[in-house]
Amino acid sequence: MRSVQEHQRVVAEMMRACRPITVPLTQAQGLVLGGDVVAPLSLPVFDNSAMDGYAVRAEDTSGATPQNPVMLPVAEDIPAGRADMLTLQPVTAHRIMTGAPVPTGATAIVPVEATDGGVDSVAIRQQATPGKHIRRSGEDVAAGTTVLHNGQIVTPAVLGLAAALGLAELPVLPRQRVLVISTGSELASPGTPLQPGQIYESNSIMLAAAVRDAGAAVVATATAGDDVAQFGAILDRYAVDADLIITSGGVSAGAYEVVKDAFGSADYRGGDHGVEFVKVAMQPGMPQGVGRVAGTPIVTLPGNPVSALVSFEVFIRPPLRMAMGLPDPYRPHRSAVLTASLTSPRGKRQFRRAILDHQAGTVISYGPPASHHLRWLASANGLLDIPEDVVEVAAGTQLQVWDLT
């Protein structure tokens, strides 16, 4: 029987790191930069006003007070976007708007609040300080400076900076494209009437959500009955567009195990096809599989919903995030005090649904350990990680908890 650590290693080694691509800014949010970005121009691009007010020579406002304002004629209006470069003559003012280019010769901006707001002439009621309220070209970014770095997450602020620099695209590591397939002839689509012997299919919805939560993209979700031809048709249709295939169900030791049957058939054996089916010393999630379909990595998970989602967390989420260069590939591990005793099967690393109290530093096992009890997992915020050599855990014991929040 394979250990959890060994199976984690096998899955991680199979996953391929993404190669950088260039995408429009509108598609880059949340991705990781695949290279450094050098500023093609300075920011601000030109000296501009930080206030609505009047561009002046500071010396022309000497001694101005509310009681004794300095009167200056207004020679020009400069709105934001005006293209021609003006020159301010001595003992005059230009009315100027926020973001408008500062005229040559002006050394300060007097805010409109410190004036009478005149149009033809203006009463300056405050002595100007040289350089005040002028945004100098390059004070934020100098042209040629590396402003964004390889491995940096593309946040809204990063997109804003890129756009301000005139960049329409960014180099990024793309999202991994994942195909999710559920198997079982007993599965019915949610919202349709259940026939005798059927249950509603939940794994594809759940696993697709987990894929997106990990930062990847879902190529398609599909459901195959216990029919090798139907399962193979889904692979043939979608696998070419996927970087990873995840299946659930059909990997145990009984009859009608469609995933095992498919990869035992001549169509999916040899060449760049092949899946290794193993038992992993864990609960839930003992039956596992890993391999390739036409060169595309595939991870086959058990069909019970809790087993499928726990297996995703343990084996798929970390290398999936690593392949995309995303930070924090592993769920945070917390040390917490167990509030009630429990038992665990000998020889298996057990992951139990848990409620973690972050403030108190305590944890309690939540619900029965059976792999079909999805309700308890939906309400849990952690996974208790119990080593395979531990059989009994007393209340008060410190345990590791995977924080799912």
From Swiss-Prot:
Single GO cellular component term: cytosol
Keywords of the record: Magnesium, Metal-binding, Molybdenum, Molybdenum cofactor biosynthesis, Transferase
Keyword Kinase belongs to the record: no
Broadest EC class assigned to this enzyme: transferase
Bridged cysteine pairs (disulfide): none
GO biological process, alphabetically ordered: Mo-molybdopterin cofactor biosynthetic process
EC id: 2.10.1.1
Reactions mediated catalytically: adenylyl-molybdopterin + molybdate = Mo-molybdopterin + AMP + H(+)
Pfam families: MoCF_biosynth, MoeA_C, MoeA_N
InterPro entries recorded: MoaB/Mog-like_dom_sf, MoaB/Mog_dom, MoeA-like, MoeA_C_domain_IV, MoeA_C_domain_IV_sf, MoeA_linker/N, MoeA_linker/N_sf
Keyword Metal-binding: yes
GO molecular function: metal ion binding; molybdopterin molybdotransferase activity
Co-factor remark: Binds 1 Mg(2+) ion per subunit.
SMART domains, sorted: MoCF_biosynth
Other remarks in the entry: Was identified as a high-confidence drug target.
Function: Catalyzes the insertion of molybdate into adenylated molybdopterin with the concomitant release of AMP.
NCBIfam families given in the database record: Glp_gephyrin, molyb_syn
Similarity comment: Belongs to the MoeA family.
Name by which UniProt lists this protein: Molybdopterin molybdenumtransferase 2
Organism: Mycobacterium tuberculosis (strain ATCC 25618 / H37Rv)
Gene label: moaE2
